[in-house]
Amino acid sequence: MKASCQVYVKGSLEAAELYKNALNLTPDPEMTAFNDDGTYEHVSLMYGETEVVAVAEDALDLHDDIIAKNKRPVMSFNVSRLGTREAVDHAYAVLSKEARINDSPDGPASPFWDDNGVVYGFSLLDKFGVHWWICT
């Protein structure tokens, strides 16, 4: 089995650029399609051969309403084993700009827990309403 996730946001082009920059991802040209208005119908963002996240334009205007009704998102993107503190710091610098909720306002920290024990990381809800949990 292979699982993957897609986020629906207003501003799919900007969101995809943000995630590409934060996590050093590249779009899969075979898994990229555009809407008539030039926004993404779908774009798979890859780290090597692994899809990390797909992005699509929220054409139904549901996303912000769902966020407004829920205090926290019902799902989080967990990116672990990012490798270095520098990679985590870079992801934080990019994703924390205009974050809606920043659970780590002082930046990445240790201890930050995952299934393997203490790591260096952060948690936040980005400007598009996507929750990220990222660590070394």
Identify what each model region corresponds to:
Residues 1-10, 17-127, 134-136:
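Vicinal oxygen chelate
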